[in-house]
Amino acid sequence: MAPQKHGSGGNGFYGNSASKAANGGAHASSGVVMTSVKRLKMEQIQADHQLFLEAFEKPTQIYRFLRTRNLITPIFLHRSLTYMSHRNSRTNSKRKSFSLNDLLFKVEKSKVDPESHNLASNLQLTFTGFFHKTEKQLQNSENEENSVSVEVLLVKLCHKKRKDVTCPVKQVPTGKKQVPLNPDISPTKLGAFPTLVVPSHEFEPVNSNTVKSYSLLFRASRPWGREHNGMTTRDTNVIEELSNRKKRYCSHQDDGETTFVAQMTVFDKNRRLQLLDGEYEVSMQEIEESPVGKKRATWETILDEKWVPPFETFSQGPTLQFTLRWTNDTADKATAPVAKPLATRNSESSTVDSSKTSNIKPPQAVAVNDSLGTDLPVRREQTHIEPCQKLHVYYQFLYNNNTRQQTEARDDLHCPWCTLNCRKLYSLLKHLKLSHSRFIFNYVPHPKGARIDVSINECYDGSYVGNPQDILCQPGFAFSRNGPVKRTPVTQILVCRPKRSKPSLSEFLEPEDGEQEQQRTYISGHNRLYFHSDSCTPLRPQEMEVDSEDERDPDWLREKTAMQIEEFTDVNEGEKEIMKLWNLLVMKHGFIADNQMNQACMSFVEQHGTIMVEKNLCRNALLHLINMHDFGLITTATIDKAMTHLRDLTQQSIAQH
């Protein structure tokens, strides 16, 4: 409309050109406005995303810190929780038949019967071959050795004593075998290969030193020259440039022999078995290649054409292949020792034949089927028939009722914040709800597993509920406690415990009415810090029961009372001493009522009777008691008892002298 108004005052040409110019300016201005709007939207999105990260960052850091602190000083054991009962491997079924008289019989039977020993299995090693590829074959193939001498030593790492600087190590030779070099891979029976057996008694603890861990040391040696040690051309050039110091370091070996070593742990320091039945291929390392001086570890980018020794080991060698079995002397059956291996992330219990890992069923699918409501028997039948699959768990983070981020699928049931292996979906959700209440977790069924919506709990009470004294202590006070300490008194709300419902995933579903569960504090107590009135130091929890303001007889008040009595002029010295003792007694015990005077007089002669006898104050004490009787505070019976006690003390004093 504006161009039409300007064009009406002149010719048509001017009005037409003005309208075109105005239309062009309008298009240009609209483009600028659109760009600014997009820029504002992007800035708003970035700012909103930054707020989302900040909202989830603080609780995550708090829970990571709590995880580390609970690992150092745990407050409770997760296996003792009701929803974590599957983590407790111990059962109380044997307690009913337990008898204290049977302990000696069981110990004697375990010593006599060798078959009842925990480690009654022998370690059998069947060597398949020693593989070491060379870049060029030797010219004199007639003299070439087709076998390698392999020696196996059992290394026992013992506990360090006070006088020892390092842990004592014992090497027990178990045997030496000739292993074929670079054999052809063909289905040959294990009986055709050299076999070595480590007896079971070698794994028994030693009397002098308690063994901490057991490991196997493989030492392979081959009589060949240094120029034909199986390395490539550039490796030979590198080895030829060794310094004289390194050559002297390796002078214990012959010039025509090269030795390779490798070590594998059998039992770790926790007595857990690390080597199960199966076929192994271990990478051997030449002794001469070990560096003399220490080098700093650095990060390095691996290129496609670059030769990397650790990755080329299993393709070029040297490697030693062998089959490991745990066997008995009587029967040649593979029986694993009682020491349990390291549990896998998705297996609830370890099986005996651990080489067949495909038969192990993960417990996640069973947990889902066991926890869902009405069609429980049908789904349990399907669980036994169909093979169990891994349960994929997705975490979807919500902020302002909008999805901000979704994690990749996890095939385990570990808590993302404290890395606790819950092993079951119900246990994971229960743990997240109770242990990480700064967030709100809602379970959503997913076709491939489960989805957990995570949002910030706005109703969380984040006030400090611990000891206020810890705030003023050093930062490392929580890590330096040697034992439990007394906390401030708290009040716990008594609630009715209804009949415990069966575990069900429906309790973690999002409520239909949209109202979030209100989190409230069920334990209330003192979170204020109090101070002593005289020293201005913080009041400790063990001092809360004593009123700091109720200072009846501090040292300064006792001294001031004695000085005031000394200033009296109308009484004699004996009466002054009786007044001092009586006033200090009343200040200490806080006698304030008339009915307490009989007890006060008896306490007076019992506590200070010896002093009154030594200073000859018995008559002054009698006058004091009579004076109190005149005022109606004590009875004559109290006077008789008190004076009888003083006379007994006087006779004892005379008898001693």
Curated annotation (Swiss-Prot):
Region (VEFS-box): 528-604
Localization per Swiss-Prot or TrEMBL: Nucleus
GO molecular function: chromatin DNA binding; zinc ion binding
The keyword Nucleus is annotated on this UniProt entry: yes
Gene Ontology terms: cellular component: ESC/E(Z) complex; nucleus; RSC-type complex
Region (Disordered): 335-363
Zn-finger region bounds: C2H2-type: 413-436
GO biological process, one term: chromatin organization
Alphabetical keyword list: Chromatin regulator, Metal-binding, Nucleus, Repressor, Transcription, Transcription regulation, Zinc, Zinc-finger
Keyword Metal-binding on entry: yes
PROSITE patterns named in the record: ZINC_FINGER_C2H2_1
InterPro entries: Polycomb_protein_VEFS-Box (IPR019135)
UniProt xrefs under Pfam families: VEFS-Box, Zn_SUZ12
Composition skew (Low complexity), residue ranges: 347-358
Superkingdom assignment: Eukaryota
Role this protein plays: Polycomb group (PcG) protein. Component of the prc2/eed-ezh2 complex, which methylates 'Lys-9' and 'Lys-27' of histone H3, leading to transcriptional repression of the affected target gene.
Family the UniProt entry places it in: Belongs to the VEFS (VRN2-EMF2-FIS2-SU(Z)12) family.
Subunit relationships: Component of the prc2/eed-ezh2 complex.
UniProt xrefs under PANTHER family: POLYCOMB GROUP PROTEIN, POLYCOMB PROTEIN SUZ12
Protein name from the UniProt record: Polycomb protein suz12-A
Species: Danio rerio
Gene: suz12a
